[in-house]
From Swiss-Prot:
Keywords: Cobalamin biosynthesis, Glycosyltransferase, Transferase. Its EC number is 2.4.2.21. Pathway: Nucleoside biosynthesis; alpha-ribazole biosynthesis; alpha-ribazole from 5,6-dimethylbenzimidazole: step 1/2. It comes from Vibrio parahaemolyticus serotype O3:K6 (strain RIMD 2210633). This is Nicotinate-nucleotide--dimethylbenzimidazole phosphoribosyltransferase. SUPFAM superfamilies: Nicotinate mononucleotide:5,6-dimethylbenzimidazole phosphoribosyltransferase (CobT). It holds the Pfam family DBI_PRT. Catalyzes the synthesis of alpha-ribazole-5'-phosphate from nicotinate mononucleotide (NAMN) and 5,6-dimethylbenzimidazole (DMB). GO terms for molecular function: nicotinate-nucleotide-dimethylbenzimidazole phosphoribosyltransferase activity. Belongs to the CobT family. The active site is at E316 (proton acceptor). It is an enzyme of class 2 (transferase). It catalyses: 5,6-dimethylbenzimidazole + nicotinate beta-D-ribonucleotide = alpha-ribazole 5'-phosphate + nicotinate + H(+). GO terms for biological process: cobalamin biosynthetic process.
Amino acid sequence: MDCSFSADIQTRIDNKTKPLGALGVLEKVALQLALIQSQDQAQAVEEIVIRKPTMLVFAGDHGVAKEGISIAPSEVTQQMVANFLAGGAAINCFCDVNQIEFKVIDCGMLAPIEVMVPEFKSHPNLIEQRLGNGTANFSKQAAMSSEQVALGLEYGARVAQSTIYSGSNLLMFGEMGIGNTSSASALLAALSPLEVNHCVGLGTGINSEQLSRKLKLVAQGVSRCRGLDAKAVLSQVGGFEIVQMVGAFLEAKRLKTPVLVDGFIVSVAAYVATLLDEETRDYMLFAHRSEENGHKFVLESLKAEPLLDLGLRLGEGTGAALALPLLKAAAQFYNKMASFESAGVTV
């Protein structure tokens, strides 16, 4: 990222009618958004514009879920996607109240949505980019082929590009997939210095017996990943929705568009994206700190300051949707708050 206007933007923020740094993290948000929107400009932007913020929820199923390490069976992925399309989920409520465009991407559920609800096949909020009928069980074999990884990265880039070209200048990523905390935990354990037990958590609320089994299965998958690069690790233990999010992060960076990152699983996808292209980090804002093991490390590793800490562990993009008003507030103070000079305030 070209940071040549960073000092000008910071001076503009510092000259607002407030003590230096008094708006805390919001000042950092304003600086980042203004810097992103100043790319390819002749000067620092005078106004931050948030246009058509869009939530992309990436959905996929996981073969490892057959091992009974989630509170729900794999069919719930498809059932929840149907709930999203019917407008009945938490993410729909939060998108509605905050005027967020909403799309759900079928990256590879066990079956297409029309098998369950035929009339949803042509739903305007559904994007089908299926890589298969769920991944293989990564505790026993590679979750997907290298060809599926490459195609998934391409699909993710495609949906990010089409969303941006349709007028959105702020993307928000969420996810849905029974078993995907196991995949995210395995990716983190394989690609970071952390031990498996520091990466695996309770997900959406498993019991101690399931947690013990989950630790064992994740360790089995991670044992095949020694010495592998990020794309190869995605093949071994990744998820269809996770690999597409990685591709979407990479494309958002290429098109100089910020992404508001949801919780643990989306943050792990963000972490993987930075391993493939470290400059993707410049375009990421982090919505919240989740209850999941490993999320703290990801946030610290990416030098991220999450905007919220509400004890959330739902996924779906709910934390990102709840954090959007803070981005709007950061833009508003940057755009409208008086300077000491214009307000006639002496300090």
